């Protein structure tokens, strides 16, 4: 039961993050065209996450040797919160927006890796409690959540553009203070709330961490060695 609860809380936390991330990423074009009036600079939104991915992906396991992933996840979320705050307050200042995008994109690998590892840890706990490893089901959760988040967010992106008047032949010069305020509300403030909720859910509801997982693995290995639990491969041989 705890395994299922933990998995669901991780899934909810990640889903909230995924929805916020996809919404904001999806409206970046409108930010550069209609708010900043700098469409030529839009390519920076592809360059920053590309470089961040190359650097942060190999850095995660190195940092995780000394820093628990709960804190790496928290640091990533705080970075995104800073990025959102800067985007909301200084959305018409290109240099500040670029710095904000660094805060926004850099922690993506940390957040995603933490979600994957947290889901993976629940596999051993499930095996310890019921004798079965549900790896395929568990590891398919994150891709499924990405698809759900993407589907939910795609409709939201179009709605944001429509509500803010960023459609048709409109230009940056046509944008009113009301249009910009509407855009920032749905592009930055609403996703910011989702990110904060994601952090709260993960921090207070997800229980399995590295220390607890190590204890689970130790207990599981002891039960496998004693024959109290039969691993899946052995069970398959017995059935055949």
Predicted regions and their residues:
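Membrane-embedded alpha-helical bundles of multi-pass transporters/translocases
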Residues: 1, 5-240
């Amino acid at each position: 039961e705890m395994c299922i609860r933990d998995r669901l809380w991780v899934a909810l936390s990640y889903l909230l993050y995924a929805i916020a991330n996809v919404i904001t990423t999806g409206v970046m074009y409108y930010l550069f065209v209609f708010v900043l009036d700098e469409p030529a600079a839009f390519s920076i939104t592809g360059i920053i996450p590309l470089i961040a991915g190359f650097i942060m992906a190999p850095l995660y396991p190195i940092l995780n040797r000394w820093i628990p992933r709960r804190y790496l996840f928290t640091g990533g979320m705080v970075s995104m919160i800073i990025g959102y705050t800067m985007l909301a307050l200084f959305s018409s200042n290109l240099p500040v927006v670029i710095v904000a995008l660094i805060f926004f994109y850099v922690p993506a690998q940390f957040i995603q890796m933490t979600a994957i590892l947290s889901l993976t840890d629940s596999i051993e706990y499930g095996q310890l409690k019921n004798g079965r490893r549900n790896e395929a089901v568990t590891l398919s959760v994150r891709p499924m959540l990405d698809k759900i988040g993407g589907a939910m967010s795609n409709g939201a992106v179009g709605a944001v553009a429509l509500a803010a008047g960023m459609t048709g032949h409109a230009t940056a010069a046509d944008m009113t203070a009301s249009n910009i305020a509407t855009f920032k509300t749905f592009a930055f403030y609403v996703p910011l709330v989702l990110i904060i909720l994601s952090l709260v859910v993960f921090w207070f509801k997800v229980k399995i961490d590295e220390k607890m997982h190590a204890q689970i693995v130790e207990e599981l290995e002891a039960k496998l060695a004693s024959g109290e639990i039969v691993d899946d491969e052995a069970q398959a041989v017995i059935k055949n």
